[in-house]
């Protein structure tokens, strides 16, 4: 099923029983977080708060609170079907050279489909139906959530931040949280390696002292939102990928105050600039780790214009100790990652990011081991192949007979197949999430790999244990008599 815009997605979710309207007054200050958190932990529906306290604008929460809704947002009916999305991305990331003319013709439709999904620029759009500029810009008109008691203030969480550096044609689109500090000012928390921060750095080098144009789209269609958090190859734009998911080209419209292009169907768009040198202390905020993060300096985004649809809907979320919405997104996107990894490492059988590991900090890999030291090669591959795993601190590698998604199985393998000195790999001074306060230096820490595979000659001189397995004939006989046993 495909969706034109966020409102179409809301309508379809409601028809499926996957969205509930909340008609009573609920405060965006803390109350929405508690309601969304309880609902998410119960596997409940997306929530449309129709009467946010002190506001007339509805708030959409818990939109991607189950893996199924993530799959639906990607145009699929099940989480399992996301493997096909991953296979497409794996092919586009590293296409196999055709072995002949016949095979070349077979791959041609795939490339044609991608080319046909290039975004379409339109002259007018619903996201610019209403325009507020100058003194009329007031973020207090938007019911921005304050999520936790110790938060520094209201926090915009689902904004798609659009930037463009001076050295490339393509725009960057990323999701960076924004602390509201005034009627027209928010703190843009982007880490130094992220696309928006790199664009800003390059801009400051080429145009020192000049304001840097930025736009933030709130409430885009689900394919565009999910395109911004999916491991899209550098050769494919997020908008083209969203078009593939949606089955139609992404429509973009030029901002009123800059040349940046934003999703035409977005509910709200914030337009403005970042003045070089204008920074402010950001935080603390409760984060996906389950802790409040440190305070640090980040650029301030000055909003010069707010455009929106008529009767806009504000899309929001919260982050907290897993499971939260980012953790659920991780569970679903896990299925997209697997084919991409398998394309590079065919020996990988399964790959699992447990949600309790804060979405990406711990990975379990099962593999078909082929030679001594093979598990260590896979560890290094996980850390280096996709930038999404740059911050993965722990990688556990096991054999294919272990279920990566069953902790009892994984712990059994670790405690029976590992020697701590021989089978751990420690790497120091590697990139680590800025929010990881356990690292000795902000943004720099260590990683550890656990080789929980059966050891081959060359890795051990001892006779290796043989797993206990019941005789199949005995199992069949017991199956036949089971119901007579009264158990």
UniProtKB/Swiss-Prot annotation:
Assigned keywords, A-Z: Cell membrane, Decarboxylase, Flavoprotein, FMN, Lyase, Manganese, Membrane, Metal-binding, Ubiquinone biosynthesis
Cellular localisation: Cell membrane
Pathway: Cofactor biosynthesis; ubiquinone biosynthesis
Cofactor requirement: prenylated FMN; Mn(2+)
Active site: 287
Residues holding Mn(2+): 172, 238
Keyword Nucleus: no
The protein's assembly and partners: Homohexamer.
Described purpose of this protein according to its UniProt entry: Catalyzes the decarboxylation of 3-octaprenyl-4-hydroxy benzoate to 2-octaprenylphenol, an intermediate step in ubiquinone biosynthesis.
Record's protein name: 3-octaprenyl-4-hydroxybenzoate carboxy-lyase
Species this chain originates from: Thioalkalivibrio sulfidiphilus (strain HL-EbGR7)
């Amino acid at each position: 099923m495909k969706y034109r815009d966020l409102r179409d997605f809301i309508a379809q979710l409601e028809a499926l029983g996957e969205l509930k309207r909340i008609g009573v007054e609920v405060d965006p200050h803390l109350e929405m977080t508690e309601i969304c958190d309880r609902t998410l932990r119960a596997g409940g529906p997306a929530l449309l708060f129709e009467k946010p306290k002190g506001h007339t604008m509805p708030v959409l929460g818990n939109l991607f609170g189950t893996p199924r809704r993530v799959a639906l947002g990607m145009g699929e009916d099940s989480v399992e079907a996301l493997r096909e999305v991953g296979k497409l991305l794996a092919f586009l990331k590293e296409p196999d050279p055709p072995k002949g003319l016949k095979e070349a013709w077979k791959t041609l439709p795939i490339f044609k489909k991608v080319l046909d999904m290039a975004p379409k620029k339109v002259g007018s759009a619903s996201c610019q139906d209403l325009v507020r500029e100058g003194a009329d810009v007031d973020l207090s008109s938007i019911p921005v959530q304050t999520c936790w008691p110790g938060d520094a203030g209201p926090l915009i969480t689902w904004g798609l931040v659009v930037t463009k550096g001076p050295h490339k044609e393509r725009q960057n689109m990323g999701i960076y949280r924004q602390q509201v500090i005034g009627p027209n000012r928010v703190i843009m928390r982007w880490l130094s390696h992220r696309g928006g921060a790199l664009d800003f750095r390059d801009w400051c080098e080429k145009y020192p002292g000049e304001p840097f144009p930025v736009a933030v789209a709130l409430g885009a269609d689900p394919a565009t939102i999910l395109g911004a958090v999916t491991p899209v190859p550098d050769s494919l734009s997020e908008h083209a990928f969203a078009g593939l998911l949606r089955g139609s080209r992404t429509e973009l419209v030029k901002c009123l105050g800059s040349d940046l292009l934003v999703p035409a169907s977005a509910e709200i768009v914030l337009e403005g600039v970042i003045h070089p040198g204008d920074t402010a202390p950001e935080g603390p905020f409760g984060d996906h780790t389950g802790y409040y993060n440190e305070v640090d300096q980040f650029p301030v985004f000055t909003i010069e214009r707010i455009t929106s649809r008529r009767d806009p809907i504000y899309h929001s979320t919260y982050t907290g100790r897993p499971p939260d919405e980012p953790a659920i997104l991780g569970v679903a996107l896990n299925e997209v990652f697997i084919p991409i990894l398998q394309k590079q490492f065919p020996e990988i059988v399964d790959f699992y990011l447990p949600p309790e590991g804060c979405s990406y900090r711990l990975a379990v890999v099962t593999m078909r081991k082929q030679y001594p030291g093979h598990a260590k090669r896979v560890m290094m591959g996980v850390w280096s192949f996709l930038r999404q795993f740059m911050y993965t601190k722990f990688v556990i590698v096991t054999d294919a007979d272990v279920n990566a998604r069953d902790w009892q199985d994984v712990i059994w393998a670790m405690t029976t197949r590992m020697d701590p000195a021989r089978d751990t790999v420690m790497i120091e001074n590697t990139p680590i999430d800025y929010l990881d306060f356990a690292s000795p230096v902000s943004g720099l820490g260590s990683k550890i790999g656990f080789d929980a595979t059966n050891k081959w000659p060359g890795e051990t001189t001892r006779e290796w244990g043989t797993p206990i397995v019941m005789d199949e004939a005995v199992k069949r006989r017991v199956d036949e008599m089971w119901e007579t046993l009264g158990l």
